[in-house]
């Protein structure tokens, strides 16, 4: 399978590879971005869940604070000295006094009712069953269930009792038995009932907490609803089944999803529920998820479209170049020269086309030049063959003179002819640029032999070559021009004798060659030129540097009336590197 995929990938065109590569990058990027967004939304959801639970806790605390205030009001009522006195005197028959006491009691209750915002009404019922009430509204349920309330409140012996009356629309009341504290008799004087406006209380609690507050529901220890909003009255049972411990969860009821946070308060052991429709709480988040996913998919498609176009723009010049190469392969160089490739782009593809066009033109020019050069070479070789007739004729003539001189016992003439023949043969047959020091010394020796016959006793020549450097390499015609310069500048212009000495030895791992004379000494600038007679010192220095490198070369030491000394330094090598 791996080989098949690798083979399929190798057969793909570059533009397809670029497109696949870009698609993979975008897909991986999409997965990373999607995972990151999902994680971010998950963290955000958790924050919302925690905030909702925190809001429920704060709401419950505020509600319980208000309920405790109402408890305090009921306690103040049952311990109010004037109310105690009025209720204790209800057994009198004085009608005027009773009327006056009723007025005082109503005034007292009205004052207490106005102290707290969430008290709907206050009811005081004396021992004879007479009722005194104050407040904005009163529920008929108090009349209907008065006996049950009395019974349960009496069992509390003056402690506060919270009760809910009714079913679907419950009424919350605070009930206390009023007991006489005169002489600590604790006789029953009546009952105080306070009806609480729970709706307004809960409506005021979450004003500044936004979408984290939904429908708050409260259930007492027995599971009876203390308060519920009409829209979500059907949720508590499902909530109680799902939320066994304080926290939050998502539940589904009647085809709708709800987010519910739950806690149980230590105060009265009441349970608080914050019920939020899922769509209300997470509508914005769901919308953002949809928008982000849609935008990324659109971006993905746009990038792929542009990526395809960019891949085509990159590979199109290359494909045209491949077509041109195939045309050259089948039709020859002329087809490549006549092709017109697009060169308007400045990128590497455009450079390839431009360079290919230039290369085809250059190859065509070189081929044409090569044809011309081959013709010239053929002509030159023919002329060279013709020109070689003269040197060979001269060499053969010199050999004839040499044998004739030997036959007539002319040894000096024979030596001159032999040396001249050696030099002529060396110039004809030796095609090497690098020779051994021994071979170079032989050239100098024969050259100086000829010069001795010319200058006789005036020329004294010494050649001293150590055996360990004889096979070291040196550029051809290095020593002979130096000997020629010495004769030219130290011997020819004067009539006095001149000693020329050439020495070669090994020193510090290198070969040191010295050419010195005892002439009058010359300016180095004069020695640098050849005067049209041979190879200059500058040329020798350059050839040594090019052959062996910069550390090696030639140095000149010349003093007036003391002579000239030229030192050559080359590496001790037996073969060319």
Swiss-Prot record:
Question: Molecular function (GO) terms listed?
Answer: ATP binding; phosphorelay sensor kinase activity
Describe the reaction catalysed, as an equation: ATP + protein L-histidine = ADP + protein N-phospho-L-histidine
Chief site of localization = membrane
* Topological domains, Cytoplasmic: 1-17, 308-577
One GO cellular component this record assigns the protein to is: plasma membrane
Which segments constitute the Histidine kinase domain?
365-574
Documented EC number(s): 2.7.13.3
Note one Pfam family from the annotation: HATPase_c
Annotated ranges, domain HAMP = 312-368
Q: What class of enzyme is it?
A: transferase
**Listed SMART domains:** HAMP, HATPase_c
Under the heading Gene3D superfamilies, the entry gives: 6.10.340.10, Histidine kinase-like ATPase, C-terminal domain
PANTHER family cross-referenced by the UniProt entry: SENSOR HISTIDINE KINASE YPDA
Its name, as the record gives it, is Sensor histidine kinase YesM
Q: Which gene encodes it?
A: yesM
